[in-house]
């Protein structure tokens, strides 16, 4: 039976995301699971525009942006040791991790 575990990571800070990806890759390599990735997924860019003045001057606006960086890691036939190590993985705040089998 061929199983694969998809690990999707999202974060606003790409450095935190890359550190977490490196940790997962190290866990996978040390436990002997076959790994595909990390695959960089498209970055979602959201732009917010607000008025600078509360009353007039609609032409005076300020723009802010928020970028959501994403990565995908695929483990093929994950070993039980790999699954246990991933359960114990401490993920920093600001990184969202989703597992799919």
UniProtKB/Swiss-Prot annotation:
**Which GO CC annotations does the UniProt entry carry?**
ribonucleoprotein complex; ribosome
Keywords noted in UniProt: Ribonucleoprotein, Ribosomal protein
Q: Ribosomal protein: present as a keyword of the record?
A: yes
Whether Ribonucleoprotein counts among this entry's keywords is yes
Pfam families for the chain: Ribosomal_S10
Listed under subunit, the entry gives:
Part of the 30S ribosomal subunit.
Q: What is this protein called?
A: Small ribosomal subunit protein uS10
Which organism was this protein described from?
Ureaplasma urealyticum serovar 10 (strain ATCC 33699 / Western)
């Amino acid at each position: 039976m061929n199983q694969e575990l998809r690990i999707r990571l999202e974060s606003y800070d790409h450095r935190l995301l890359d550190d977490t990806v490196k940790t997962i890759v190290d866990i996978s390599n040390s436990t002997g699971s076959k790994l595909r990735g990390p695959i960089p997924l498209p970055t979602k860019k959201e732009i917010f525009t607000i008025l600078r003045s509360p009353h007039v001057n609609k032409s005076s606006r300020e723009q802010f942006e928020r970028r959501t960086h994403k990565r995908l890691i695929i483990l093929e036939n994950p070993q039980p040791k790999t699954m246990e190590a991933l359960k114990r993985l401490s993920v920093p705040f600001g990184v969202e991790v989703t597992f799919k089998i």
